[in-house]
């Protein structure tokens, strides 16, 4: 099972925010998730990023691969270098 850390879109039409979740790579974008580790709201100025650092490091140590966008967000949150 290939596990990814990725964004799950939430919110209303034209008003999105995203949850940073751990999911199997074969599930749909908004499908079933394994764990939720934070959220990202791009509409606030500056963008609102909240990550549970302990959970994120745990899943990265288990071998979960972040998507390109999530990797940038984790760097901004100080989880990875």
Swiss-Prot record:
The record's section on PROSITE patterns has: RIBOSOMAL_S16
Q: Which UniProt keywords apply?
A: Ribonucleoprotein, Ribosomal protein
**Does the record bear Ribonucleoprotein in its keywords?**
yes
Q: Which GO terms describe its biological process?
A: translation
Please give the Gene Ontology molecular function terms for this protein: structural constituent of ribosome
Q: Which Pfam families match?
A: Ribosomal_S16
Record-level GO cellular component terms: cytoplasm; small ribosomal subunit
The record, for SUPFAM superfamilies, names: Ribosomal protein S16
- Listed HAMAP family: Ribosomal_bS16 (MF_00385)
Q: Quote the NCBIfam families the UniProt record gives.
A: S16
What the record says about family reads: Belongs to the bacterial ribosomal protein bS16 family.
Record-given protein name:
Small ribosomal subunit protein bS16
Species of origin: Caldicellulosiruptor bescii (strain ATCC BAA-1888 / DSM 6725 / KCTC 15123 / Z-1320)
**Gene designation:** rpsP
């Amino acid at each position: 099972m290939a596990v990814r850390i990725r964004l799950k879109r939430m919110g209303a039409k034209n008003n999105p925010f995203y949850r940073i979740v751990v999911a199997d790579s074969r599930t749909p974008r908004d499908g079933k998730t394994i764990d939720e580790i934070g959220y990202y709201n791009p509409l606030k100025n500056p963008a609102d990023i909240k990550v549970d650092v302990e959970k994120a490091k745990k899943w990265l140590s288990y071998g979960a691969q972040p998507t390109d966008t999530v990797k940038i967000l984790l760097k901004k949150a100080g989880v990875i270098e």
